[in-house]
From Swiss-Prot:
This is DNA polymerase IV. GO terms for cellular component: cytosol. It comes from Moorella thermoacetica (strain ATCC 39073 / JCM 9320). Binds 2 magnesium ions per subunit. It is found in: Cytoplasm. One of its GO terms (biological process) is SOS response. Its main location: cytoplasm.
């Protein structure tokens, strides 16, 4: 293939949750930090771990606290602080946007940047990558792995090749030597289920996928087969889209709980916290929505998703929570344990369609929401929140 300008970056914050705590407490640097549920409960699970814990002790996300403590008895176990993770993610995105407006967040700890138009102002893409890593390290206190490539796919693959604190370039000419020997599961977008399907076809490496007859892949997987074949060859035409969230059909958030939650009372606390977070994101985006959905997963990974459409558009936590609570009570037995909770609002429209009610309730609530948003924008997410978040069931503000 023709050589290209590797001007697409994927910046990935290393071991993000654990790194946030190490950034806040320098005494934790170099120590095995494990973000998990309360140590006292046998149902607590590991949500994240520092590289010291991963590489030195074999700690993995999803294992129980009991297992992690057995492998790493002297590890530093810390309860999750999702409000801090959101705050640090926002700070990192601000630094990225100092280099280019073309920033597309992919998750809370990684984003793509297109820096092809920044050469005169900031230098070559490699120079931008080095400066970006330096600023995030100095201003936020977190190391990052950055991949550079001619496409989002190759930038993502490059970022995965050197962790932590890596800087890797992956051009089209590098694909046969660097990508093709890798297991097919390491190709961006391939999960365990697709890996199993490909194994039945005798495909175990990315190179084998790249050399497999595309006609057979299309016959077996439809249009996905063609996309898989292209990705294995490093081909990806999708642009970095800073407005990718502008066309979203829903806004939501989900949390893996630090332990098994049992009973409606505990789960409702999490639903309320998520409703507050989703409502704030909806308002920041300038939307209203009508359809509230919840997702629940038990410790055996059985999943439930249900939704309810409201008679009116909303951006308030109260409306979202009431609908989510109704869905919980209607579709989830109280005795059944919960490990993951998600809440979303769909049917989004511009907030200009808001209608006033006869008694001004909507406008009064809107003024209150705006005041709370302004406080959080200025002082951080923890400046004001529900008191119930400080109970043992709270997850966003350190209650657990």
């Amino acid at each position: 293939m023709v050589s290209s300008d590797c001007s697409i970056l994927l910046c990935d914050a290393n071991s993000f949750f654990a790194s946030v705590h190490q950034a806040l407490d320098p005494g934790l640097r170099g120590r095995p930090v494990i973000v998990a549920g309360r140590e006292a409960t046998r149902h607590g699970i590991v949500l994240a771990a520092s590289y010291e814990a991963k590489l030195g002790y074999g700690i993995k996300t999803g294992m129980t606290v009991r297992e992690a403590r057995g492998l790493c008895p002297h590890g530093v176990f810390i309860p999750p602080r999702h409000d801090l993770y959101i705050e640090f993610s926002t700070r990192i995105l601000r630094i990225m946007r100092d280099f280019t407006p073309l920033v597309e967040p992919f998750s809370i700890d990684e984003a793509w940047l297109d820096v092809r138009g920044c050469r005169d102002l900031h230098g070559s893409p490699l120079t931008v990558a080095r400066r970006l890593k330096q600023r995030i390290r100095e201003e936020v206190g977190i190391t990052t792995s950055v991949g550079l490539g001619p496409s989002k796919l190759l930038a993502k693959m490059a970022a995965e090749m050197q962790k932590p604190d890596g800087l890797t370039v992956l051009d089209y000419a590098d694909v046969p030597g660097k990508m093709w020997p890798l297991p097919v599961r390491e190709l961006f977008g391939i999960g365990p289920r697709m890996e199993a399907h490909l194994a039945k076809l005798g495909i175990h490496t990315i190179g084998e996928l790249a050399g497999f007859p595309v006609e057979v892949l299309i016959k077996r997987f439809g249009v996905v087969g063609r996309i898989l074949h292209q990705c294995a060859r490093g081909i990806d035409y999708s642009p970095v889209d800073p407005h990718s969230l502008d066309t979203v059909k829903s806004i939501g958030h989900q949390i893996t709980l630090p332990r098994d939650y049992r009973g409606y009372e505990e789960i409702e606390v999490v639903l309320l916290e998520l409703a507050e977070l989703v409502a704030r994101r909806v308002r920041l985006g300038g939307y209203l929505g009508r359809t509230v959905a919840i997702s629940l997963k038990d410790p055996e990974f059985h999943w439930l998703g249900r939704s309810r459409t409201l008679p009116h558009y909303t951006d308030t936590a109260g409306d979202i929570y009431a609908a989510a609570r109704h869905l919980l009570h209607r579709h989830w037995p109280e005795w059944r344990a919960v490990r993951l909770v998600g809440v979303s609002l769909a049917g989004l429209v511009p907030a200009t369609v808001r209608q006033e009610d006869l008694f001004g309730r909507v406008e009064r609530q809107a003024r209150l929401d705006r005041a709370c948003d302004q406080l959080k924008n200025r002082y951080g997410e923890r400046v004001i929140h529900r008191a119930v978040s400080l109970t043992g069931a709270g997850v966003l503000y350190g209650g657990s």
